[in-house]
Amino acid sequence: MAAAEPMGPAQVPMNSEVIVDPIQGQVNFEDVFVYFSQEEWVLLDEAQRLLYRDVMLENFALMASLGHTSFMSHIVASLVMGSEPWVPDWVDMTLAVATETPGGSDPGCWHGMEDEEIPFEQSFSIGMSQIRIPKGGPSTQKAYPCGTCGLVLKDILHLAEHQETHPGQKPYMCVLCGKQFCFSANLHQHQKQHSGEKPFRSDKSRPFLLNNCAVQSMEMSFVTGEACKDFLASSSIFEHHAPHNEWKPHSNTKCEEASHCGKRHYKCSECGKTFSRKDSLVQHQRVHTGERPYECGECGKTFSRKPILAQHQRIHTGEMPYECGICGKVFNHSSNLIVHQRVHTGARPYKCSECGKAYSHKSTLVQHESIHTGERPYECSECGKYFGHKYRLIKHWSVHTGARPYECIACGKFFSQSSDLIAHQRVHNGEKPYVCSECGKAFSHKHVLVQHHRIHTGERPYKCSECGKAFRQRASLIRHWKIHTGERP
């Protein structure tokens, strides 16, 4: 086994080439690692150090998921423990080229050799590579849940190893083009292609990219450029001026240099929209041409994009690969799982710009906004009546058809809507799912709870236009209005 000369972290050349095996496409962890001296490290604040740690650990997880588990084990261990990343005095920095062994080590990989006299307390492994953590490490660590099956792992290294048990599972999907990824970081990098955002913004960050461009030949990219920019840009010690022509992420097309400069060269002749990639333009043009080249073999339905066809086919196969880690409910689309999880988190990301009311679904916000705009886009073809919500039109349509397909098995009463049947059944079972947060009183219908809650808030939204008197309930306003009209109540 041939050994190289000892090398400290400050001696590592920042613009060294990535070692790539021409057959295997081997990429080493050292090639995407950012080195700091102790003097450089103290200039970073806490947020920058945490960002550094997260970026490096995610890079390692990506390496491990690809089966490339070569790394400097003492540095990865210090990242897991949250300690400083520079090389301690007790570490023997002798690097050796590992030969192929019966244990299955990858040929041509670099492995860090530690001092055998240093006592260690914990150890854990990824594949054939083992990390040992010194005594005195933290007793508690952050939990890392698997985005595919919900299993919670104790560290990111075990998570990376576990995710290899889900072949072909890519839970992170781009909502613009349907492309799927194993890691959220890859999705984030991919989305910059749609937004036109430049992945690497200045020559200042070049020394820390460690020729990340060479890694782009693989299917998964590493989080080094954009994420590192946030803490590199704040410190003047990282200034490095290099001519633009030294940095060549690609080599063949004319558009690649323009893409690095943030330009978009592929323009749609129909609407003028521009794209940085030709395949994105081709997909977009199907909006104008109506082309749907991907056909479902089961039902014959066609789609403009292959990932959408794959999602559709789960209707026929019954496949439900996305499971909620909290309640166990399964879904056929990752987007449905994301929307469902808002039930548990209470997240309401869609906010009305007029009144500030927030909703968990975008469609609900659109329906709500019609209250402010007065828009009623849904017209009944029978009587010409307009409605602000589509579901109200559907409900109204039963007036003309007389259809009441939903029957109560307790009393035989029929209803035109399933929601009306569910609400009616509470008369029989006594269920009162809507509880007042102020006094604890429960109600069988949500609108009754809303009316009751106004007792606590003092809200009186229904105002008489004649005398100005306000009421908590609409029915009370209608009864009051008869005083002015002279109509007998």
UniProtKB/Swiss-Prot annotation:
Alphabetically ordered keywords of this record: DNA-binding, Metal-binding, Nucleus, Repeat, Transcription, Transcription regulation, Zinc, Zinc-finger
Localization: Nucleus
Residue ranges crossing the lipid bilayer per the database entry: none
Zn finger spans (C2H2-type): 144-166, 172-194, 266-288, 294-316, 322-344, 350-372, 378-400, 406-428, 434-456, 462-484
Main localization, broad class: nucleus
All residue ranges annotated as the KRAB domain in the record: 27-98
Disulfide bonds: none
Entry-linked SUPFAM superfamilies: beta-beta-alpha zinc fingers, KRAB domain (Kruppel-associated box)
Molecular-function annotations in GO: DNA-binding transcription factor activity, RNA polymerase II-specific; RNA polymerase II cis-regulatory region sequence-specific DNA binding; zinc ion binding
GO cellular component: nucleus
Biological processes per GO annotation: regulation of transcription by RNA polymerase II
Entry similarity comment: Belongs to the krueppel C2H2-type zinc-finger protein family.
Function comment: May be involved in transcriptional regulation.
Stored PANTHER family: KLUMPFUSS, ISOFORM B-RELATED (PTHR24404:SF114), ZINC FINGER PROTEIN (PTHR24404)
Protein name per its UniProtKB record: Zinc finger protein 772
Species annotation: Homo sapiens (Human)
Encoding gene per record: ZNF772
